[in-house]
Amino acid sequence: MLLSFTLAGLRALAAEPPASWVDPDTGHRVIRLTREPGSDSFYFNYNGFTPDGKKMAYTTTNGISVLNLETLEAKPIVTGRARPIVVGRKTSNLYYTRPTDNPFFSTLWRVNLDTGETRKLADLPCRAGVSTINADETLGAGTFIEGDANAGGAYDGTVPLGKMTDVNLGEPENKGEMMAQRLAAALPMTMFTINLQTGKIKTLLQHNTNWLNHLQFSPADPTLLMYCHEGSWQMVDRIWTIRTDGSHNQLIHKRSMENEIAGHEWWGADGETVFYQLHFPRGGHVSFIASYNVKTGQRVWLQYNPDQSSIHDNSSPDGKLYCGDGDNRSPWIFLFRPVILPNQRTLGRNLIKGGYLESEKLVNMTKQNYRLEPNPSFTPDMKYIVFRSNMFGPDYAFAVEVAKANPTP
């Protein structure tokens, strides 16, 4: 009996992924950040880092944990079913929601990642979710479907429960069908802000039959909110911004070609640049990381090739580099360096600035099941790119060093 337990333990130990390695195809060092099978870094545009850059929150099968990025020591910070929102830009508070016994209701909480102090902030309205916190941590923002309207079970307002298995199945195989079903239902929605001190809710949009989703506050301007008209990208003008007083509801990119798609948008660290992927047309060979500065109106389009494509891209804190998580056609974690083409005395005003991306492969992801999207993000010191992966079976969070460990792999 003792021998069988010992052999089982040895097999489990042997199956554990390496703590670090140098990718033989790229020469870059990869570090496994998390030890728990089923642990994931955050979605690519959710901030998971404390303002001092020393800690990172991540999800586990039993809640949310916090990782010391200097020592790689981790500890649970939220136990049980919970859905993270973001780590604050001003404090070390992590904001999250918890489900209740009723599948259409949830509660809003915060926990300090340094002290562990926890506070319930509010009971949310029926079918409501909060998905972003503003720069000075005074407001949250979210949406809910009004009344009892539904789309036959397709994205129609039940509360996310949090992941409870070692292997994240990722996106559903029939995601496209479900999204088309939900978009066609045209369910009336409300977009709101919630005061994090008082719990008071303020309506921004009401009775809106667009599918309102992916809310993101500017990381610098506490009154500026980005959101999207969700749905298959070729069917919607997706990316919008609005002020917290309900004014300046502005479309950021309008489609001009059949099957043109724009999406997977995110804020630059400056809090005034909106980045997004742009494809002319869907399934074609012309793609860009595009950006729009909400203060100056400047647009920049950086072209990339199909063999540089990613599900998600992201930008470095200083705005000088980009990264991508690859896809089934190009299974790599990428580093991108932008090249802006000089203006050859172009005549005209308000023209788009053009350029292209030079890519460097950082991690071979051929063993990745891309139903789990890696969701890359730069660490605050810009020395690493964090991503999630199931290349060893269960999910773990990893980091790849931007600088090469081996210059001649």
Segments predicted by a language model, with ranges:
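Blade/loop signatures of beta-propeller domains
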Residues: 13-31, 180-190, 350-351
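Beta-strand-rich domains and repeat architectures in extracellular enzymes and scaffolds
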Residues: 18, 29-62, 215
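Surface loop/turn motifs at the tips and blade-to-blade linkers of beta-strand repeat domains
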Residues: 34-39, 77-80, 121-126, 204-210, ...
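Hydrophobic beta-strand positions that form the internal "hydrophobic ladder"
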Residues: 56, 94-95, 139-140, 224-225, ...
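Asp-box/WD-like beta-propeller blade repeats and closely related beta-sheet repeat scaffolds
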Residues: 81-84, 88-92, 97-190, 203-206
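Short, conserved, GDST-rich strand-edge loop motifs in beta-rich repeat architectures
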Residues: 99-100, 142-186, 228-236, 277-284, ...
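Blade-level signature of beta-propeller repeat domains, shared across WD40, Kelch, NHL, RCC1
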Residues: 372-409
